[in-house]
Amino acid sequence: GGIKPGVLGFTDEELQVLVSEAHHRGMRVACHARSAAAVKQAVRAGVNFIGHANYLDDEALALLEANRDHVFAGPAVAWEISFLEHYQSFGFETGSPEHEGYAAELKATQASVRRMRDAGVRVLVGGDYGLNITPHGTYARELQYFTDYFGFSPGEALQAATKHGGEAFMPDGRLGTLETGKIADMVIVKGNPLEQISLLQDADNIRAVIKDGQI
């Protein structure tokens, strides 16, 4: 059973009602959308955050670009990359359907993320954590994935995690950057992540965490 790949889980009318009702109640809407058809449906319905967006076609990219002022995308690649780094320890062989499937998906994701970035679509860090190979507390490694796999500079990866993440959660602009009058959420680190993004993965380099102005 289950839904076949490429088959949309909702009709356009169903999704539009869900999004409309959520927005009416002051909520923002996130969805999982891997195929180009799903991404296009989500953008047309007014979804705020699209998770994955692995397989974009030209029409899907054009829709994202046209709506880039109010839609965000997050590839959520930690699961894919972690699997590809450790698949043999899970009992899978090189060339197995699982290995080849995730490798192909990552290749498609790399192409889609680079296209979104070039089109000015805000691409976010995070997603699909809390699993055995993506435990909570390991989010910082995804910033390195953005530099290693998607061609982001360390500064661009940090911006995806902070400024753009803040804009996604609080469109009023109160979160995500260090400016007078904004929410004082920040991390003080030893070293310069603009020169070495991987230092954020070492807890010993985290000197202080400030939340709402409180250490």
Regions found by a protein language model. Give the residues of each.
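Active-site core of metal-dependent hydrolases
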Residues: 1-107, 124, 129-131, 150-151, ...
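Generic structural signal for individual residues within well-ordered alpha-helical segments
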Residues: 16, 62, 158-159, 198
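His/Asp/Glu-enriched, well-ordered alpha-helical/loop segment
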Residues: 24, 94-97, 107-192
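Short glycine-biased active-site loop of nucleotidyltransferases that positions the nucleotide triphosphate
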Residues: 42, 135-138, 198
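Short, Lys/Arg- and Gly-enriched loop/turn segments at beta-strand edges
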Residues: 193-199
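Short aromatic-centered micro-motifs
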Residues: 209
